[in-house]
Curated annotation (Swiss-Prot):
Pathway info: Lipid metabolism; steroid biosynthesis
Protein name: 3 beta-hydroxysteroid dehydrogenase/Delta 5-->4-isomerase
Enzyme Commission code(s) on record: 1.1.1.145, 5.3.3.1
Effects seen without this gene: Disruption reduces the cholesterol oxidation activity at least 90-fold.
Organism: Mycobacterium tuberculosis (strain ATCC 25618 / H37Rv)
CDD domains to which the protein is assigned, alphabetical: 3b-HSD-like_SDR_e
The organism's taxonomic lineage, starting at the top: Bacteria, Bacillati, Actinomycetota, Actinomycetes, Mycobacteriales
Length: 370
């Protein structure tokens, strides 16, 4: 079916804003940016907020799986940015019911609670944080766009729950006057990152990064946090009747596809780490990690060094076009990868040193006899 084109010139003010996951990496950066732009913001998270007090900021601590708490969170709100999620990168038939239910309760049930509460409260706009992995099914994707179908091959619960939740959010567009859209980031990085490079640093400090996985020509894209936030705000502003964004999904990234190891190399070298020289087969590593994951869930083995999805990102092309976001939202990355790296390299070096000192202290404590 042909999509009826909206008018990209139609935009709106955001009004009073709710940010879920406001204590997290993306959410906290989004809250800060919105406050800097003069918006009134309510930050909602189950974790305590570390944001400094601000006259335009209200902090609500609570659980998104509680419908009553969601009702309180959306009261008086005009625009919702939903960034809260559990990131579980293992999945498949071998996972336990408890592991699966935890992800679905937050990522799907929590999204449903929040959106329905917003509809009842008269919220006008809902921007959902999805993932580019919703279309990744183990194939090479070079410059893919939003016409790609959802994957039905799930290596991880994060992707599985994001597919279900994104479909739900977009299907609710226009219901009770609320307009919805979904943003599909790639790997999110920048000051405050506690996921992408932290996981890499953990592997380095444990001595696990001895080889490079996959071909050097395989590329992925990333989403610098302030480029992503720029995309969020543009999308919300375009959630207007007859506008371009209602009911749509958008890839938002830095538009600079790069091999993951080449992307990480300047960071690790700045941390004083030697760069591996040897390369090994990506599919072989994925096969080993998939089997290891089954042993983890069925027999209690330690978790695999890499999740199957993480391995695929190392040896398959998985990067996406931002042409639709450019056309519909006027999106262009605010920062190049080099500009962003210059800005946040001191943060990453500091994080690595902190983690190294913590690991050394733990090792020392473990060797001290009681």
């Amino acid at each position: 079916m042909l999509r009826r084109m909206g008018d990209a010139s139609l935009t709106t003010e955001l009004g009073r804003v709710l940010v879920t996951g406001g204590a997290g990496f993306v959410g906290a950066n989004l809250v800060t940016t919105l406050l800097d732009r003069g918006h009134w913001v309510r930050s909602f998270d189950r974790a305590p907020s570390l944001l400094p007090a601000h006259p335009q900021l209200e902090v609500l601590q609570g659980d998104i799986t509680d419908a009553d708490v969601c009702a309180a969170a959306v009261d008086g709100i005009d625009t919702i940015f939903h960034t809260a999620a559990i990131i579980e990168l293992m999945g498949g038939a071998s996972v336990t019911d408890e592991y699966r239910q935890r992800s679905f309760a937050v990522n799907v049930g929590g999204t449903e609670n929040l959106l329905h509460a917003g509809q009842r409260a008269g919220v006008q706009r809902f921007v959902y944080t999805s993932s580019n992995s919703v279309v990744m099914g183990g194939q090479n994707i070079a410059g893919g766009d939003e016409t790609l179908p959802y994957t039905d091959r799930f290596n991880d619960l994060y992707t599985e729950t994001k597919v279900v939740a994104e479909r739900f959010v977009l299907a609710q567009n226009g219901v009770d006057g609320m307009l919805t859209c979904a943003i599909r980031p790639s790997g999110i990085w920048g000051n405050g990152d506690q996921t992408m490079f932290r996981k890499l640093f953990e592997s380095v400090l444990k001595g696990h990064v001895k080889v490079l996985v996959g071909r050097k020509s395989a590329r992925l894209d990333n989403s610098y946090v302030h480029n992503l936030i720029h995309g969020f705000i543009l999308a919300a502003a375009h959630l207007v009747p007859d506008g371009t964004a209602p009911g749509q999904a958008y890839f938002i990234n830095d538009a600079e596809p790069i091999n993951m190891f080449e992307f990480a190399r300047p960071v690790l070298e700045a941390c004083g780490q030697r760069w591996p020289k040897m390369r090994i087969s990506g599919p072989a590593v994925r096969w080993v990690m998939t089997g290891w994951q089954r042993l983890h869930f069925r027999f209690g083995f330690p978790a695999p060094l890499l999740e199957p999805l993480a391995v695929e990102r190392l040896y398959l092309d998985n990067y996406f076009s931002i042409a639709k976001a450019r056309r519909d939202l006027g999106y262009e990355p605010l920062f190049t990868t080099q500009q962003a790296l210059t800005e946040c390299l001191p943060y990453y070096v500091s994080l690595f040193e902190q983690m190294k000192n913590e690991a050394r202290a733990e090792k020392t404590a473990a060797t001290v006899k009681p």
